[in-house]
């Protein structure tokens, strides 16, 4: 049987705010964007998520990050 995946799309805006699935995450005071994104990705990685792609939106200086993890089938 083929592996099944679930996906998550994360939007990162030019100010470094992150939104995913209707929830917005904001940097801590004084935290740079790179450290903030790393901290966010570490949290998702601990939950089994893996980055599989980044789609930059050049004109708006923002991006979409696509993650996936194995889908857990519900027991019947």
Annotate each PLM feature.
Residues 1-76:
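Terminus-proximal functional modules
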């Amino acid at each position: 049987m083929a592996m099944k995946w679930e996906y998550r799309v994360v939007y990162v805006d030019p100010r470094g705010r992150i939104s995913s699935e209707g929830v917005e995450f904001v940097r801590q005071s004084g935290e740079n964007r790179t450290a903030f994104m790393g901290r966010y990705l570490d949290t998702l990685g601990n939950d089994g998520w893996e980055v599989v792609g980044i789609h930059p939106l050049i004109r708006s200086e923002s991006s979409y990050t696509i993650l996936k993890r194995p889908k857990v089938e519900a027991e019947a």
